[in-house]
Amino acid sequence: MHESLKKKWYVLQAFSGFESRVAQSIKEHVKLNKMNDFFGEVMVPSEEVIEIRGGQRRKSEYKFFPGYVLIHMIMTDSTWHLIRNVPRVLGFIGGKSDKPSPISDKEVDIIINRLRQIGDKPRPKTLFEPGEMIRVNDGPFADFNGVVEEVDYEKSRLKVSVSIFGRATPVELDFRQVEKN
């Protein structure tokens, strides 16, 4: 296959917050224009995180590259114009505006490996480290300060050393029961 007819990875800049919508629009434009052979995967590298708002657990999406979409495609004049005419696409990153350059296979491998490592299990948005100061905001130890001793991300629990009457007391708490100082 001729080098210019090989699919390569390109980075698109899109309106921030609209990355997923842009990726979906690209797929629809490709299908409508019957250009499936020129396009491969369109992705917005992200992971699901759990954050706690108002005492409630919520899943949200954390984008690795906010405002950017990765696209595997063969770059021709017609594919370039198709992408440039998708709403909320600001342009390609790298190279010249009319002749974008692809990102290296090494960079793509790093991104894809990172996505594989994450898997499907959402991680907590707030990460705790042993030795870190926290404040208990719920339960019998509410309003006490403590030091993180151990972190169990599988069960979303912490072992915290809370100072009660001048003595350090080990307590096991849920992520939802604490906040960072």
UniProtKB/Swiss-Prot annotation:
Highest taxon of source: Bacteria
For the keyword Lipoprotein, the answer is: no
Q: Which SMART domains match?
A: KOW, NGN
Q: Which residues form the signal peptide?
A: none
Keywords in alphabetical order: Transcription, Transcription antitermination, Transcription regulation, Transcription termination
A single GO cellular-component term on record: cytosol
Disulfide connectivity?
none
Listed under GO biological process in this entry are: DNA-templated transcription termination; regulation of DNA-templated transcription elongation; transcription antitermination; transcription elongation-coupled chromatin remodeling
Q: Where is the KOW domain?
A: 130-161
Which family is annotated?
A: Belongs to the NusG family.
Q: How does it assemble?
A: Monomer. Interacts with the transcription termination factor Rho and with RNA polymerase.
Q: What does this protein do?
A: Participates in transcription elongation, termination and antitermination. In the absence of Rho, increases the rate of transcription elongation by the RNA polymerase (RNAP), probably by partially suppressing pausing. In the presence of Rho, modulates most Rho-dependent termination events by interacting with the RNAP to render the complex more susceptible to the termination activity of Rho. May be required to overcome a kinetic limitation of Rho to function at certain terminators. Also involved in ribosomal RNA transcriptional antitermination.
Q: What is this protein called?
A: Transcription termination/antitermination protein NusG
Can you name the source organism? Buchnera aphidicola subsp. Schizaphis graminum (strain Sg)
